[in-house]
Amino acid sequence: MSDLKVTLHDAQMEIFRSEKRFKVASCGRRFGKSYLAAWVLIIKALQSTSKDVFYIAPTFQQAKDILWGILKEVGQDVIKSAHENTATLTLVNDRKIYLKGSDRPDTLRGVGLSYVVLDEYASMKPEVWEMIIRPTLADVKGEALFIGTPNGKNHFYKLWVDAQDESRDDWEAFQFNSTDNTFLDPLEIEAAKSTMSTQASRQEFEATFESFSGGVFKEEWVKYS
């Protein structure tokens, strides 16, 4: 097996290198969440001596569409086998990476895990973490990464705020703009933002948690050319 060269930009590396057990990352579109998740899962699975790892998206199909190809790309030197139908990778140390959907909660039960990535957690039911996934980490004090773009001030926002509480010394919160991805052309992001309302562009590209109040019009929501 050749040495793995983890290729991530500085903002991704800040999350990757964090030694906190639980990490909550609010990131703008095109930040590079999927490549970060893939590298984290590969490394954590290789480091695990007894338990496997999960990647969970809102739906199973989303999990496959988002990460299956990327995982096979970045992990090609350490993958022993790949099962396409179940979206399961077995690595050279016989640890497995499972792609899952939060829309199939029964497939998330009955296992012990060393690591889990919950991608676009804002679009999942909070019970997926609280009642199903959290207990699976208890055996070996497994870790978790919550990552996604905000969707209003829902349970993802609450978790992100709670992760900043100094009394929770095993949690850490992150917030990164799309332009923190140094592989992106910032002019392209600005061009996209120019077609959106201020509030929407803040949420999608600056990863801020916005309150979209129904029935209340705000002048700042409109862009004028």
Report each predicted region and the residues it spans.
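Conserved P-loop
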Residues: 20-88, 157-158
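Inter-Walker segment of RecA-like/P-loop motor cores
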Residues: 60-114, 202, 209
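Residue-level preference for the first positions of well-ordered beta-strands
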Residues: 22-24, 52-54, 97, 115, ...
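ASCE P-loop NTPase helicase motor core
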Residues: 123-195
